[in-house]
């Protein structure tokens, strides 16, 4: 008869602690790149939509991750991740 595998792996941090730590890190990074009034408006929108729930925490984490990714990708001056056209000495371009 089949049995569920025993939990032999290392103990994981509880999801809610991990989510709150991640949210704190994202907030700290977001205030370096976006106006506080925008972030406050986003927080108000999430609160008005989801209230004080884990669904709201997950939503704001997802939105902040997307905003920061796009911000870095389009060329944040604080980051090396952005798209920066590279100069070629011979003018050749890769396709």
Curated annotation (Swiss-Prot):
Give the quaternary structure: Homooligomer, may form homodimer. Interacts with p6-gag region of the Pr55 Gag precursor protein through a (Leu-X-X)4 motif near the C-terminus of the P6gag protein. Interacts with host UNG. May interact with host RAD23A/HHR23A. Interacts with host VPRBP/DCAF1, leading to hijack the CUL4A-RBX1-DDB1-DCAF1/VPRBP complex, mediating ubiquitination of host proteins such as TERT and ZGPAT and arrest of the cell cycle in G2 phase.
Known HAMAP family for this protein? HIV_VPR
Which compartments is it annotated to reside in? Virion; Host nucleus; Host extracellular space
Q: What is the stated purpose of this protein?
A: During virus replication, may deplete host UNG protein, and incude G2-M cell cycle arrest. Acts by targeting specific host proteins for degradation by the 26S proteasome, through association with the cellular CUL4A-DDB1 E3 ligase complex by direct interaction with host VPRPB/DCAF-1. Cell cycle arrest reportedly occurs within hours of infection and is not blocked by antiviral agents, suggesting that it is initiated by the VPR carried into the virion. Additionally, VPR induces apoptosis in a cell cycle dependent manner suggesting that these two effects are mechanistically linked.
- Bilayer-spanning residue ranges: none
Indicate whether Ion transport appears among the record's keywords. Answer: yes
GO CC entries: host cell; host cell nucleus; host extracellular space; virion component
Question: Which top-level group of life is the source organism from?
Answer: Viruses
The text of the family note is:
Belongs to the HIV-1 VPR protein family.
Key word Transcription present in the record?
yes
Signal sequence span is: none
Mind telling me what this protein is named? Answer: Protein Vpr
Q: What else is known?
A: HIV-1 lineages are divided in three main groups, M (for Major), O (for Outlier), and N (for New, or Non-M, Non-O). The vast majority of strains found worldwide belong to the group M. Group O seems to be endemic to and largely confined to Cameroon and neighboring countries in West Central Africa, where these viruses represent a small minority of HIV-1 strains. The group N is represented by a limited number of isolates from Cameroonian persons. The group M is further subdivided in 9 clades or subtypes (A to D, F to H, J and K).
Q: How is it modified after translation?
A: Phosphorylated on several residues by host. These phosphorylations regulate VPR activity for the nuclear import of the HIV-1 pre-integration complex.
List the Gene3D superfamilies hit by this protein, alphabetically.
6.10.210.10, VpR/VpX protein, C-terminal domain
Question: One GO biological process from the UniProt record?
Answer: symbiont-mediated arrest of host cell cycle during G2/M transition
Q: Where is this region: Homooligomerization?
A: 1-42
Q: What are the entry keywords? A: Activator, AIDS, Apoptosis, Cell cycle, Host G2/M cell cycle arrest by virus, Host nucleus, Host-virus interaction, Ion channel, Ion transport, Modulation of host cell cycle by virus, Phosphoprotein, Transcription, Transcription regulation, Transport, Viral penetration into host nucleus, Virion, Virus entry into host cell
Q: List-wise, which residues carry Phosphoserine?
A: 79, 93, 95
